[in-house]
């Protein structure tokens, strides 16, 4: 069974692979594609100059076959496909060399994971109750805001009580002095 691949100089070469070597290559490429989901790893690659090498950019283009559903179903971190797509842009590759850019991308990935994906999972698990779930979350948000407002009011009242206590203590002391 033959397979086209890119060598380090960017040229297509026809190579004969055994079943075992195909399996190994599949696993290695799968792991590498999933590693692209980590913005810190992208920062590492960019700082080491990999994104400036033509053979590596060609390899990233070659890896786009992972977007095919038969391959994508093997991925544990599907956001890696978005990163792989973004890496096709020279501007994105250049910006990943800077720590703050990588940190920004990492923050966005974390926010996506924390909020959108959890809510989506709950909605997918309970499609009939999805509307009720959204309403109950809105009610919970309102209750949370009310609780915060009450806490703020109590906080505002406490300094007044402390001030009144100090004033009464001061007035008691001043009466004793007279």
Curated annotation (Swiss-Prot):
GO cellular component, as recorded: core mediator complex; mediator complex
Annotated region described as Disordered, given as residue ranges: 129-178
Keywords for this protein: Activator, Nucleus, Transcription, Transcription regulation
Keyword Ion transport: no
Family matches, as Gene3D superfamilies: Mediator of RNA polymerase II, submodule Med31 (Soh1)
Localization (cell): Nucleus
Keyword Nucleus: yes
Protein name: Mediator of RNA polymerase II transcription subunit 31
Species per Swiss-Prot/TrEMBL record: Caenorhabditis elegans
Organism phylogeny: Eukaryota, Metazoa, Ecdysozoa, Nematoda, Chromadorea
Encoding gene (name): mdt-31
């Amino acid at each position: 069974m033959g397979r086209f691949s890119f060598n380090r100089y960017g040229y297509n070469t026809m190579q004969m692979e055994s079943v075992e070597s195909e399996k190994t290559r599949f696993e290695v490429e799968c792991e590498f594609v999933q590693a692209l989901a980590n913005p810190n790893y992208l920062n590492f690659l960019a700082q080491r100059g990999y994104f400036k090498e033509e053979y590596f950019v060609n390899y990233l283009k070659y890896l786009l076959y992972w977007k095919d559903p038969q391959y994508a179903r093997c991925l544990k971190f599907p956001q890696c496909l978005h990163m792989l797509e973004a890496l096709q842009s020279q501007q994105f590759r250049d910006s990943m060399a800077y720590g703050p850019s990588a940190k920004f991308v990492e923050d966005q990935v974390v926010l996506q994971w924390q909020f959108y994906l959890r809510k989506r999972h709950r909605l997918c698990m309970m499609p009939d109750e999805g509307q009720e779930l959204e309403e109950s979350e809105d009610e919970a948000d309102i209750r949370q805001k009310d609780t915060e407002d009450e806490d703020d009011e109590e906080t505002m009242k406490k300094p007044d009580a402390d001030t009144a206590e100090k004033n009464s203590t001061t007035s008691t002391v001043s009466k004793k002095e007279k």
